[in-house]
From Swiss-Prot:
Observed effect of gene inactivation: A single deletion produces no gas vesicles.
Induction: Probably part of a gvpF1-gvpG1-gvpH1-gvpI1-gvpJ1-gvpK1-gvpL1-gvpM1 operon, maximally expressed in early to mid log phase. Detected at low levels in growing cells, at higher levels in stationary phase (at protein level). Not detected in isolated gas vesicles. Gas vesicles appear earlier when grown in static culture, possibly due to O(2)-limitation.
Record's protein name: Gas vesicle protein K1
GO cellular component, one term: gas vesicle
Note: Encoded in a 14-gene plasmid locus called p-vac which produces predominantly short, spindle-shaped gas vesicles during all stages of growth.
Domain of life of the native organism: Archaea
Free-text function comment from the UniProt entry: Proteins GvpF to GvpM might be involved in nucleating gas vesicle formation. Gas vesicles are hollow, gas filled proteinaceous nanostructures found in several microbial planktonic microorganisms. They allow positioning of halobacteria at the optimal depth for growth in the poorly aerated, shallow brine pools of their habitat.
Gene transcribed to yield this protein: gvpK11
Gene Ontology process terms (BP): gas vesicle organization
Subunit and partners: GvpF to GvpM interact with each other in vitro, and may form multi-subunit complex(es).
PANTHER family linked to this entry: PROTEIN GVPK 1
Keyword Repeat: no
Family of this protein: Belongs to the gas vesicle GvpK family.
Keyword Kinase in record: no
Length: 113
């Protein structure tokens, strides 16, 4: 998905809205993963779990409403695909630079004494 500067204002606004919604969706997913981690560790009370679940669901519902209202489902999906590829490539590049011990290349391991 590209945000071309020569697009008309509606296209630019739709693209920007799609980008913002995509980023917020990714943040909500990260929050959900953190909530699950905290639930599994037992650090949340039942009330906190309920409240957190309602808040996350409200965020997801609002994002879905916004995507429908602005007709940006396809654009959001495209941004997510593009971001998935970027992240996958970054992980692969990091993996290529890892040593078998998993601590990076020998050049990056200096003794600063």
């Amino acid at each position: 998905m590209e945000l071309a500067l020569d697009d008309d204002a509606d296209d630019l606004q739709g693209g920007l809205t799609a980008l913002v919604v995509t980023v917020v969706e990714l943040l909500v997913e990260a929050l959900e993963q953190e909530a699950v981690r905290r639930m599994e560790s037992g650090s949340l009370s039942e009330d906190e779990i309920e409240r957190l679940g309602r808040q996350l669901q409200a965020l997801e519902d609002e994002l879905e409403r916004l995507k429908q209202q602005e007709d940006i489902n396809a654009e959001v999906s495209e941004f997510r695909e593009d971001l998935d590829h970027v992240i996958r490539d970054a992980i692969e590049q990091l993996s290529e630079h890892e040593t078998p011990s998993g601590h990076g290349s020998p050049e990056s391991q200096r003794d600063d004494v």
